[in-house]
Amino acid sequence: MPIWPFRRSQASVDSELLLTAVTAASRQSALFGEGRVADTLDGRFETMALHGALALIRLRAEPELGPLAQAFTDDFFRLLDSGLREEGVGDTSVPKRMHKLASAFYGRLDAYAAAIGARNNEALAAALGRNVMKDEASAFAPTLSDYALRVAAHQGERPASAMFTPEGWPALQA
């Protein structure tokens, strides 16, 4: 008799792989540095939000991937919660901070999905400039927009499972 008789769902297993790939893609060194994304807690959140949004945009393209999209979203927010706690945010403050992060994430997801769906590089660059760079006129925002559109196109041409590996996330050209 097995010690733990319950199996994890395939969506849960796949979500863990996807979250690992999203985390790795969001930590590319080419994203950070002078004139690029600030290497701060906020900057790291923004790169995670961008890559998490790209993953969800791809998953939402196939309704049968709904369970994976939900498992990924749950795991994504558990990771953010864990990160806040590791940074020393008190237990009583975490729910309020998570509410703000969730609101910020879903606002970004909506803006990025609309711009990517319309293949509107200017709108995406403006949203990325405003959210990620904190400056709509940022010189790096168009580069980040080109990158996000390239990643979205790359993922749209492949099965969703390709996102579970580093090859599913083309690197930002430095």
Regions inferred by a protein language model and the residue ranges of each:
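Surface/interface-facing alpha-helical segments and adjacent flexible terminal/loop regions used
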Residues: 1-174
